Amino acid sequence: AYQDYGLPYCFSASLFNTGISEPNDYNKDTIEKITNNGEMTESTSDNGVRPNVLFVQLESFFDPTEYEDLQMSEDPIPNLRKMFENYSSGYFKVPSVGAGTANTEFEVLTGMNLRYFGPGEYPYKTKLKNQVCESAATAFSAFGYGTHALHNNGGNFYSRAKVFNNIGFDSFTSKEFMNILQTTENGWSKDDILLTHIKDALDSTEQEDFVFTVSVQGHGNYPTEKVIENPKITVTGAPTEEKNNAWEYYVNQVYEMDQFAGNLVKMMEERGEPTVVVFYGDHLPTMGLEAKDMKSRYLYNTNYVIWDNIGLQKEDRNIPSYQIMADVMDSLGLHSGTVFNYHQQRRQTKDYLKDLELLQYDILYGDQYVYNGKPPITEGHMQMGIKEVTLTDLVENLDETYSLYGTNFTKWSKVYINDEKQESTFLNNTRIELPNSKLK
């Protein structure tokens, strides 16, 4: 919407205009025609191979060489570059610039197009935190997949804990369930921590898994002073020294994000399980870029690549974020989820976008004619964290303090006695100290 109407209009309109307005021709007959009398709600498969499917949303990621004025001492994305060359890849059209992570996420997970919502709206905040909705999680669960979401930042940001529950995930592991030891100079968790938790998600079930990972390392703001003492990659070409410092910081975060991507692929290769991994950037970084700065001359493009170990044909094309889930599922012979089925069947047909708006309205704001009284999800069932947090022992120390022993504690763990929060000190993942609590 911002690219259509501009910032001033969208900002003011976002205060009053949310949701999808009812289309003029919205009625039961129209929806039944669009969905072939509800056939699009069915789940079918025409392929015996059901791999693990991992989506990795890389915070503020794009290929820095797309910024034409920037010179770097070496390629900041050698692992992803190799993937670009050998696997399906291209530009990834996203709904926002410099911010709006949750909106790209929304399009990827639901297949819905943000264009039909209010300008500047976040459906996570306005709709999905209070209403269940089918998504990639429910689509994959229809085939028996375990479904997991991961994020190395706070679980309540963008109401993710509520949203992921409402769209059908089995589990959500946020930073509150991670022992994060490494952070950027700006204080964001480094992405390498996600490897352990992706492995835990895959190990938590006997069947195939859909794992949706949201990274945070590349997050702004980007420091305008030099904060990395000995950067792996040096940068020149930005218009000012301050901008150059910001770009150098960003490029070095991207380099480490690329190392994370390479390590994830290596981990999946070593597991030996059939697997597809999709990497993509959620939006461009907040660097004040203009269209003329970019090779693509477009500010809503990031990059994506689809790595696999099952022999998928390389097929390069540019794709909007709301279509990628349907594309990946189609390549695997999986047809599930009303909106994803719609994309697979109708993308090249007349009135594709017009009918998509009608379908989105019916599912989120209308009478849900598409489900004929049988929606694919009626309530959430999600648990926070993959591994159970347990308390196994309470020990009184000689100084009349107490030590709690258990498993999977983190620095975010809180201790309550009779519903009263206690002062506590996290020592490690098996021990927490209570310096001032009275238990007698």
Short names for language-model regions:
Residues A1-Q3, L439:
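Transmembrane and membrane-interface helices of multi-pass
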Residues D4-Y9, P23-K28, I77, A102-E105, ...:
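Alpha-helix initiation and N-capping motif
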Residues G6-G48:
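Helix-hairpin-helix/helix-loop-helix acidic hairpins
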Residues G38-R50, L58, D63-E433, K440:
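Solvent-exposed soluble domains appended to multi-pass membrane proteins
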